[in-house]
């Protein structure tokens, strides 16, 4: 069973920001933000045509500065948020803003990758997330499955909850919390949990992971030394409400049960340098992607701590006697965790990896040299999970 070859797209500039177009559930589309100090920065809208295995792209100008983080509205295909750096009074500030892409680009295009970006279009600024009182923005999180009206931004040691009003042209700060303690505390990343009615957020600062209840803006759990070095990224299991994955500069990926945070449930040590990203598959939570500055992307099958530790179980009525016996044998043995594949198409640090929001078997990864790679879960594993 031959697997499809990876598809590679090169941006002209360095890049570290990647997001699927979350509100798009039919077409496979990703947004990539560039980091250039010399030229106008860009957002590339990448459309993947999986029938022909080719990429089509559109380019939007993002003239305000180099993009450190990008996230797409869960409700409106045309809306996105960026964190970008700009220089003012010879100081570099990282700001955040909400943008709208031109209407005709929301649903992609059919321009081939070789067309020049001379016909790049500009983004419409909807609103700034005002951080003058709070410091540098590290990320913007949209309320999962929300109506695209609620956002959280992480600014230095502040967790800020925003309401977007008047067709997203105005961001009103509705609540905030601050990290307190010794030293210069700064959030590095965060994830908004899709569980508990979207009332919980997890954040990383230094080596610690904290859980917050955004109704009271109070801390609900804290994993003090979650990693030996800086925690880079977090993700929630979409099917198990208390399960959280983290990764960091200690080259490890850890899985936590937030009801008992004294020890991780499981630890992976497959990367040889900092791990920048960890992502659960949206449908099949045993599939976990990690990206690292060892220039590799690893796909792991964490089935023992997934929502289906015994694989895909079938109703008794659907089985013949012989199959019944086979099913009983299957039930007795939990499946083994394993590394499914290591993807080595990158030659530089891989700063981002994301699953498609339209196809659960497809993902994109982005390395700092501007190389975007689209890969798929191996077919044999896909059928093993489905059948």
Curated annotation (Swiss-Prot):
Keywords: Repeat, WD repeat. GO terms for biological process: protein ubiquitination. This is EARP-interacting protein homolog. WD repeats lie at residues 132-172, 182-222, 226-266, 270-310, 345-385. Belongs to the WD repeat EIPR1 family. InterPro entries: EIPR1, WD40/YVTN_repeat-like_dom_sf, WD40_repeat_CS, WD40_rpt. PROSITE patterns: WD_REPEATS_1, WD_REPEATS_2, WD_REPEATS_REGION. The keyword Acyltransferase does not apply. The keyword Lipid metabolism does not apply. SUPFAM superfamilies: Putative isomerase YbhE. Pfam families: Beta-prop_EIPR1, WD40. Disulfide bonds: none annotated. It comes from the Eukaryota.
């Amino acid at each position: 069973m031959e697997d499809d070859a990876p598809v590679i797209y090169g941006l002209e500039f360095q890049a570290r920001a990647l997001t699927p177009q979350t509100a798009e559930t039919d077409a496979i589309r990703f947004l990539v933000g560039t980091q250039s100090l010399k030229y106008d920065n860009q957002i590339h809208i990448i459309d993947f045509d999986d029938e022909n295995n080719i990429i089509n792209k559109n380019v939007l100008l993002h003239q305000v500065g180099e993009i450190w983080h990008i996230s797409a509205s869960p409700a409106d295909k045309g809306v996105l948020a960026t964190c970008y750096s700009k220089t003012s009074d010879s100081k570099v500030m990282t700001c955040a803003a909400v943008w709208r892409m031109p209407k005709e680009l929301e649903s992609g295009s059919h321009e081939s990758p070789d067309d020049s970006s001379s016909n790049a279009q500009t983004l419409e600024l909807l609103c700034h997330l005002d951080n003058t009182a709070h410091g540098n923005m590290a990320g913007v999180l949209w309320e999962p499955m929300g109506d695209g009206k609620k956002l959280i931004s992480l600014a230095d040691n502040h967790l800020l909850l925003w309401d977007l009003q008047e067709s997203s042209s105005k961001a009103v700060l509705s609540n905030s919390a601050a990290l307190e303690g010794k030293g210069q505390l700064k959030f590095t990343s965060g994830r908004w949990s899709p569980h508990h009615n979207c009332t919980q957020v997890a954040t990383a600062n230094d080596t610690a992971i904290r859980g917050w209840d955004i109704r009271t803006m109070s801390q609900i759990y804290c994993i003090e030394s979650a990693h030996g070095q800086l925690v880079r990224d977090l993700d929630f299991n979409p099917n198990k409400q208390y399960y959280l994955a983290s990764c960091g500069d200690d080259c490890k990926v850890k899985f936590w049960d937030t009801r008992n945070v004294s020890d991780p449930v499981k630890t992976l040590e497959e990367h040889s340098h900092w791990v920048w990203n960890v992502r659960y598959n949206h449908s099949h939570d045993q599939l976990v992607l990690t990206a690292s500055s060892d220039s590799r992307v690893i796909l792991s099958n964490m089935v023992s701590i997934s929502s289906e530790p015994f694989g895909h179980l079938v109703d008794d009525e659907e089985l013949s006697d012989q199959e019944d016996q086979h099913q009983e044998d299957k039930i007795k043995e939990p499946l083994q965790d394993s590394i499914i594949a290591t993807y080595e198409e990158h030659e530089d640090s891989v700063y981002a990896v994301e699953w498609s929001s339209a196809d659960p078997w497809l993902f994109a990864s982005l390395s700092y040299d501007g190389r975007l790679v689209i890969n798929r879960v191996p077919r044999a594993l896909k059928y093993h999970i489905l059948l």
